[in-house]
Amino acid sequence: MKWGVYILRCGDGTLYTGITDNLPRRLEAHRAGRGAKYTRGRGPLALVYWEKQTDRAAASRREWAIKQLTRTEKEALAASWDGDTPATE
């Protein structure tokens, strides 16, 4: 699987942005409390955005760019997502 950037909506309404090369495994880690400290105790978690990248460096650059966006801009990005993920492609 190629690298990508994802956004999760936490149970408290906040958004978390991260990168992975295995989205199903990473989502399971977050949901089991083995993901980022930020998402622990903030469930339930919902995937609201996924974007494929060519490699880890590209994914990291895109993650940084997304983290610079305002919440409104992140919400617009999430709203534009068509729902395709590595598990359904």
Place the predicted regions along the sequence by residue.
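GIY-YIG nuclease catalytic motif and its immediate N-terminal context
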Residues: 1-53, 57-89
